């Protein structure tokens, strides 16, 4: 009986120490887990709007990737480098610059604000991408109609 209580208590302590760390959250196969989100590069070539639509169909809350920190940018760059087909040199991300009523606005496709800025150039009504020549670490703006691979991101559900 004492051993059972000891083991049960140990398991309870382990469970409580892991709660809130992403334990129990799982990404589908072929997706990567990082900082409470799932990520995946798709080597299909789509324009920005089609890629965003495609991402939203992958899972609840999915969008083109939003990048909130330098560490997340490093993770995305690593994941893209590991999984992009050799012939591709760009991938779409969820950042879009729009000019509405002569007011420029920059937002991620998930609706969140830009809190980490890694843009090299800024133009009106453009979409953002990562380039191979920078190790997929710097953001560039480009036409939203170009068809290139893209990265999706979503928060996993319990």
UniProtKB/Swiss-Prot annotation:
Location within or outside the cell: Secreted
Entry keyword set: Disulfide bond, Hemostasis impairing toxin, Platelet aggregation activating toxin, Secreted, Signal, Toxin
Main localization (coarse): secreted
GO molecular-function terms, A-Z: toxin activity
Known tissue expression: Expressed by the venom gland.
InterPro entries in the cross-refs: C-type_lectin-like (IPR001304), C-type_lectin-like/link_sf (IPR016186), C-type_lectin/snaclec_domain (IPR050111), CTDL_fold (IPR016187)
Protein's name in the database: Snaclec convulxin subunit alpha
């Amino acid at each position: 009986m004492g051993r059972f209580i000891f083991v049960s208590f140990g398991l309870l302590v382990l469970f409580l120490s892991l709660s809130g760390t992403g334990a129990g959250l799982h990404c589908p196969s072929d997706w990567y887990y990082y900082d409470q989100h799932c990520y995946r590069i798709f080597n299909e070539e789509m324009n920005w709007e089609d890629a965003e639509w495609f991402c939203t169909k992958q899972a609840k809350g999915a969008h083109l990737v939003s990048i909130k920190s330098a560490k997340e940018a490093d993770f995305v760059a690593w994941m893209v480098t590991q999984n992009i087909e050799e012939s591709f040199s760009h991938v779409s991300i969820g950042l879009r610059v729009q000019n509405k009523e002569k007011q420029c606005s920059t937002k991620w496709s998930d609706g969140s604000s830009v809190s980490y800025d890694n843009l090299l150039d800024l133009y009106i009504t453009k979409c953002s991408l990562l380039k191979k020549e920078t190790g997929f670490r710097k953001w560039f703006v480009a036409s939203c109609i170009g068809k290139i691979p893209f990265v999706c991101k979503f928060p996993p559900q319990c």
